[in-house]
Amino acid sequence: MRILVGTPTYNGQLTTQYTGSLLALRSELGDQVDWKTTSGTLLAWARNTLASLVLESDHSHLLFIDSDIDYPPSLIRRMIDFDAPMVAAVYPHRVLDVQRFHAMARAHDDPAAAWARSLSFVMELETPPVERNGFYRARYAGTGLMLIKREVFETLRDTCPDLYRPAAGSYYGHQGLKHVLQCFEPQYDEAGLAMSEDVSFCRRWQQAGGELWVVFDDTVGHVGPFTFRARA
């Protein structure tokens, strides 16, 4: 097993929470982990680059960890041991619904419980729920903390040949790639609206016959800015 930790960044910026988690993960997994970042504003291009690097290397897995995510390394070990081709850890949106938090605070005496119940999460489970060893099958999940086996990219390359192109002369060629698998390019929903790169990726994998599993019984942080604004 050899895992490439892939992290898209904006101008190379990483949060301290991300860095602390990555150091702990390296301590847990040792030399089984390599690390690669990208820098830019287009997430689909960044994720395409990292996926394509796996195909042009001997890595068995790609572990997406976004630069604003923190997590316990034991969670990554659980995801590895679950041994599914694609598994994601669920994290909250970086949004505070003040009205919902106010309602939850009135319903719960524990402030932490009120806070947790006021958040929304980046996933949609299948209905009815399908569970295995504490993991649930999902329609989609965010790719901010997602473990993907090499076979997923090989399958998408073979079943979607229009997505696999020579990289020469492109952004991807400048990243050192010979070919690029553009599996994160946005798809369009039934209304003709572009979907996010992570939802599009999940849908492509499921259209190829794959499954997505998620775990949400561990604590994952999604770091973001918050402006404290008021009059004293």
Where are these regions (language model features)?
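N-proximal low-complexity "stem/linker" segments adjacent to membrane-targeting elements
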Residues: 1-45
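Residue-level recognition of beta-strand->loop/alpha-helix junctions
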Residues: 36-39, 90, 216
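Short beta-strand-to-loop acidic/aromatic patch adjacent to the donor-nucleotide binding site
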Residues: 58-70
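Short, Asp-centered acidic motifs that coordinate Mg2+ and/or phosphate
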Residues: 61, 85-86, 212
